[in-house]
């Protein structure tokens, strides 16, 4: 089989222009998308943050107590053995 010889062109100038255009398009699209975002009010942000923190505390407390119970259960056979 005959391989085609690759044609090399000096297109670094074209690539740099394309990169600048691509970055410009990306930034413009990002600004458009951020303009569509509905940002929460301060009150909503605070109340939802408090809810998340309370749920983290609750779940971590439950996991702690379940761990303590299983730790106690696993030590029982060795206490009477």
Swiss-Prot record:
Q: Keyword Protein transport: yes or no? A: yes
Q: Which domain of life is it from?
A: Bacteria
Q: Where in the cell is it found?
A: Cell inner membrane; Cellular thylakoid membrane
Name one matching Pfam family.
Answer: SecE
Give the GO terms filed under biological process for this record: intracellular protein transmembrane transport; protein secretion; protein targeting; protein transport by the Sec complex
An example of a Gene Ontology cellular component annotation for this protein is: plasma membrane-derived thylakoid membrane
> How does the record say this protein sits in the membrane?
Single-pass membrane protein
Q: Which GO molecular-function terms appear in the entry?
A: protein transmembrane transporter activity
Query: Which regions span the lipid bilayer?
Result: 50-70
Which keywords label this protein? Cell inner membrane, Cell membrane, Membrane, Protein transport, Thylakoid, Translocation, Transmembrane, Transmembrane helix, Transport
**Statement: the UniProt record of this protein carries the keyword Protein transport:** yes
- Kindly state the subunit structure of this protein: Component of the Sec protein translocase complex. Heterotrimer consisting of SecY, SecE and SecG subunits. The heterotrimers can form oligomers, although 1 heterotrimer is thought to be able to translocate proteins. Interacts with the ribosome. Interacts with SecDF, and other proteins may be involved. Interacts with SecA.
What PANTHER family does the database record attribute to this sequence?
A: PROTEIN TRANSLOCASE SUBUNIT SECE
What is known about what this protein does?
Answer: Essential subunit of the Sec protein translocation channel SecYEG. Clamps together the 2 halves of SecY. May contact the channel plug during translocation.
The UniProt similarity line reads: Belongs to the SecE/SEC61-gamma family.
User: What is the protein name for this chain?
Assistant: Protein translocase subunit SecE
């Amino acid at each position: 089989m005959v391989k085609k010889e690759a044609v090399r062109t000096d297109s670094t100038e074209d690539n740099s222009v394309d990169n600048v255009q691509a970055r410009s398009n990306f930034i413009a699209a990002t600004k458009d998308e951020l303009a569509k975002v509905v940002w929460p009010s301060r009150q909503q942000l605070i109340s939802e943050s408090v809810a998340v923190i309370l749920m983290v505390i609750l779940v971590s407390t439950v996991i702690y107590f379940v761990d303590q119970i299983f730790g106690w259960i696993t030590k029982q056979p060795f206490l009477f053995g």
